[in-house]
Regions:
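Catalytic phosphate/nucleotide-handling subdomain of diverse soluble enzymes
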Residues: 219, 224-257, 266, 330-361
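N-terminal glycine/serine-rich phosphate-binding loop of ATP-dependent small-molecule kinases
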Residues: 1-96
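Internal helix-turn-beta structural module
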Residues: 299, 303-319, 324-327, 333-401
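Glycine-rich phosphate-binding loop of actin/hexokinase-like ATP-binding domains
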Residues: 151-255
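Phosphate/pyrophosphate-binding loops at sites that engage ATP/ADP/AMP, CoA/4′-phosphopantetheine
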Residues: 70-85, 191-198, 313-324
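Glycine-rich beta-strand-to-loop/alpha-helix junction loops that act as flexible
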Residues: 9, 90-93, 209, 323, ...
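Short beta-strand-loop/turn "lid" adjacent to the catalytic site in phosphate-handling enzymes
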Residues: 71, 75-123, 144, 150-159
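Adenine-nucleotide phosphate-binding core of ATP-dependent small-molecule kinases
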Residues: 266, 273-277, 284-319
Length: 401
């Protein structure tokens, strides 16, 4: 079955067309600058090279139409007609407490996603716009929603509750939800395939470290704790997000500088993290280069960033009563060799031992980077959220036939 996977953001639509018969990516690309006069479609050609098609001013419906047109284009397309698309799978950022797994998208489900707008005001409306656009252009084609939050719905209350007055949970849904769930689910399953072990017997810590980052404790195949919270701002220090911070520091700044909630939101989401500390960049490659050139603030940011990851791994190992496997994924986790080494060295007391040579030469490939003598396997696994979405979509739609 050919599955079109869509990730609709506020100003972009990313896509992959995946043939689930053999797990091959037939086409990929994305529309950027939706709603602006210089919108464009970036797509990959069959030889691997990239091309751009100017679109001008388009909305989400126009963006989805542009994606479908490029897929069926007589010269650069890979399918003859829309009818070859068996189903469409959507990344949906927030499913609240309603969704613990991927679901067929119906009017009722769509309304429940809309009910979560307050929890993900930037992402969920864009996700819904994409779903509605597909419904208009491809009526009758089944659509499936795959939620970033779903994998973490197995967390026990002691992990997801905040110690706020209980009424804020009951009335407003304030609790830890966690994100990157599709990635954490994919790499926790994939690492067990690579190692030839049973996920139901393993204690795994998955580290999704990119511009946004989160860590998850996966006990016997289920998420039991994760570093992101009600929003993706909690947890690790990130490219531009603050991560864990004393809430008292935020109320102090609000009062002192007369900040509005929106202004504070912008600071903790867009102006903090690595960018905030270095005042240089949110890109870890640039920060590593600046550190090598002797920039003290870049050095400090790296130390803070790495220490936070180490702390979470240590905490989750304690929570699960040990750890068998540590996984690194995401743009930074897959490629920043120095960071992986610095994160893992303090974990030697837990039996974590890297093969330094293998670690330094592994970038973006599935590789066991721990030494043979290590009590804990450390593995790099490139994430593939789109493949997970495609498989879920295929499984759900196949059962309808």
């Amino acid at each position: 079955m050919k599955i079109l996977v869509l990730n609709c953001g506020s100003s972009s639509v990313k896509y992959k067309l995946i043939d689930t018969e053999n797990d091959t990516v037939m086409a990929e690309g994305g529309v950027e600058k939706i709603g602006l006069p210089d919108g464009f479609l970036k797509y990959k050609l069959s030889d691997g090279s990239k091309a751009i098609r100017e679109l001008g001013l388009v909305d989400h419906k126009g963006a989805v139409k542009a994606v479908l047109d490029i897929l069926t284009d007589p010269e650069v397309g890979c399918i003859r007609s829309y009818s070859e698309i068996g189903a469409v799978g959507h990344r949906v950022v927030h499913g609240g407490e309603k969704f613990s797994k991927s679901v067929l998208l119906t009017d009722e489900v769509l309304q429940q996603i809309k009910d979560c707008y307050g929890l993900a005001p930037l992402h969920n409306p864009a996700n819904v716009t994409g779903i509605e656009a597909v419904e208009e252009i491809l009526p009758g084609v089944k659509q499936v929603g795959v939620f970033d939050t779903a994998f973490h719905q197995t967390m026990p209350a002691k992990s997801f509750m905040y110690a706020l007055p209980y009424k804020y949970y009951k009335e407003d849904g304030v609790r830890r939800y966690g994100f990157h769930g599709t990635s954490h689910r994919y790499v926790s399953q994939r690492v067990c395939e690579i190692l030839g072990v049973d996920i139901n017997k393993e204690k795994i810590i998955t580290c999704h470290v990119g511009n946004g980052g989160s860590i998850t404790a996966v006990l016997y195949g289920k998420s039991v704790d994760t570093s992101m919270g009600l929003t993706p701002v909690e947890g690790l220090m990130m490219g531009t997000r603050v991560g864990d911070v004393d809430p008292g520091a935020l109320t102090y700044l609000m009062k002192k500088h007369n900040l509005s909630a929106d202004e504070l939101q912008k600071i903790i989401n867009k102006e903090s993290g690595v960018l905030g500390v270095t005042e240089l960049s949110s890109d870890m490659r640039e920060i590593e280069a600046a550190d090598k050139a002797g920039d003290p603030r870049a050095h400090l940011a790296l130390e803070m960033y790495e220490q936070r990851i180490t702390k979470y791994i240590g905490a989750y190992a304690a929570e699960m009563g040990g750890v068998d496997i540590i996984v690194f994924t995401g743009g930074v986790g897959e490629n920043q060799t120095g960071l992986r080494g610095n994160v893992c060295r303090p974990l030697g007391f837990m039996g974590v031992e890297l093969d330094e040579q293998l670690n330094m030469t592994t970038r973006g490939t599935e590789t066991v980077i721990s030494a043979p003598s290590s009590k804990v396997k450390v593995v790099v696994v490139p994430t593939d959220e789109e493949m997970m979405i495609a498989r879920d979509t295929r499984d759900i739609v196949s059962k309808l036939k």
